């Protein structure tokens, strides 16, 4: 028997919420689940580690990148099982979106995820009809 995918999604949402709230120091709400990859089944009873980190902050929204690991109890070895990308928005007491602090990526992985976040956001906005494809400069640069 394996961990139910919906249970893992809920755990990832909680971890992403904590990460977004810590970064913004505000109440945050889930806007979207942009990507989920169920790469490896998680057997029931496994030690599951959900790591959530703000990969990029925009004006009021934050992209949260999640890595999920199965940890061997005896050796401590970790095997990556899943990953996901969520978007959260910080809100005030009335539920109105508020600005969030920017992110300064440090590591190579952080810089990679930071740069990719803008492309993912532009793609999402183009697909939703909220951004003209000609204005998606970072996204267009991939095809030049």
Please name every model-derived segment.
Residues 25-41:
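Small beta-barrel nucleic-acid-binding modules, principally OB-folds
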Residues 43-47, 55-144:
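HotDog/MaoC-like acyl-thioester-processing domains
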Residues 1, 20, 95:
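Short strand-loop-strand
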Residues 1-10, 141-144:
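A conserved, well-ordered hydrophobic junction motif at loop->secondary-structure transitions
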Residues 7-25:
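Active-site helix/loop of acyl-thioester processing domains in fatty-acid/polyketide metabolism
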């Amino acid at each position: 028997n394996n961990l139910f995918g919906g249970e893992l999604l809920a755990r990832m949402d909680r971890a992403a919420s904590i990460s977004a709230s810590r970064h913004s120091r505000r109440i945050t709400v889930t806007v979207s689940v942009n990507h989920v990859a169920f790469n490896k089944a998680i057997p029931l009873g496994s030690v599951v580690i959900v790591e959530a980190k703000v990969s990029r902050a925009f004006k009021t929204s934050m992209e949260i990148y999640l890595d999920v690991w199965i940890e061997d109890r005896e050796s401590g070895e970790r095997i990556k099982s899943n990953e996901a990308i969520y978007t959260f928005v910080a809100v005030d007491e009335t539920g109105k979106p508020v600005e969030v602090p920017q992110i300064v990526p440090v590591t190579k992985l952080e810089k990679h995820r930071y740069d990719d976040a803008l492309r993912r956001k532009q793609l999402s906005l183009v697909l939703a009809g909220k951004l003209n494809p000609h204005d998606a400069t970072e996204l267009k640069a991939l095809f030049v």
